[in-house]
Amino acid sequence: MQSIKLVVVGDGAVGKTCLLISYTSNSFPTEYVPTVFDNYSANVMVDNKTVSLGLWDTAGQEDYDRLRPLSYPQTDVFLICFAIISQTSYTNVKSKWWPEVTHHCPNCTIILVGTKCDLREDKESLEKLREKHQQPLTFQQGEQMAKEIKAFCYMECSALTQKGLKQVFDEAIKAVIFPDRDKATNKKNSKCSIL
């Protein structure tokens, strides 16, 4: 059985731990808990192929910049995450996370993930953004960033509603076990462009 190591990175509070907890337990943590997710391993079936999936959470805060890369060796696929309601986390994809990941793992597969997509329609979140003269990031902005960092694809999900959540992990697994898939064909025919 093939083993896959998946590491999740991104700014603090973009929802990395919630993404992992929601995926592995089908429940959403109700309070913010900075990185308490233990490494998790499970057998997962994707396209009639069973793989042993190892999930690794990381702390996004600067305090952990020197420790975080210790979890990178032997990584098969990274999920670089940003919150669709945080311009700063989006900007940091290119200025911090992509350079860090590609420095330590130059040939690794990257999936860019826009988290908290449920908040694109949330009145309270939209009002807070309006007060700062901002708006949620668009799917097209995510796709553009994915092209710029040469990510395998861009996907969006919500750990709260689980919309697109399973598809993110399925796509990450497929990107590793079927590396020769034509990306152009993949973008047209797969679940990679989920809203």
UniProtKB/Swiss-Prot annotation:
Task: Report which superkingdom the organism of origin falls in.
Answer: Eukaryota
The GO annotation for biological process reads: actin filament organization; actin filament polymerization; aggregation involved in sorocarp development; chemotaxis; cortical cytoskeleton organization; establishment or maintenance of cell polarity; macropinocytosis; regulation of actin cytoskeleton organization
SUPFAM superfamilies reported for this sequence: P-loop containing nucleoside triphosphate hydrolases (SSF52540)
The UniProt keyword set, sorted, is: Cell membrane, GTP-binding, Lipoprotein, Membrane, Methylation, Nucleotide-binding, Prenylation
- A GO term from the CC aspect: lipid droplet
Which cellular compartments is it found in?
Cell membrane
Q: Which GO terms describe its molecular function?
A: GTP binding; GTPase activity; protein kinase binding
Originating species? Dictyostelium discoideum
Name any one Pfam family assigned in the record.
Ras
**Protein name in the entry:** Rho-related protein racB
Membrane topology label: Lipid-anchor
State where GTP binds: 10-17, 57-61, 115-118
Residue list for modification Cysteine methyl ester = C192
Q: Where is the lipid attached (S-geranylgeranyl cysteine)?
A: C192
Question: Motif Effector region located where?
Answer: 32-40
Assembly and partners are described as: Interacts with pakB.
Which ranges of residues are annotated as propeptide in this record?
193-195
Assigned protein family = Belongs to the small GTPase superfamily. Rho family.
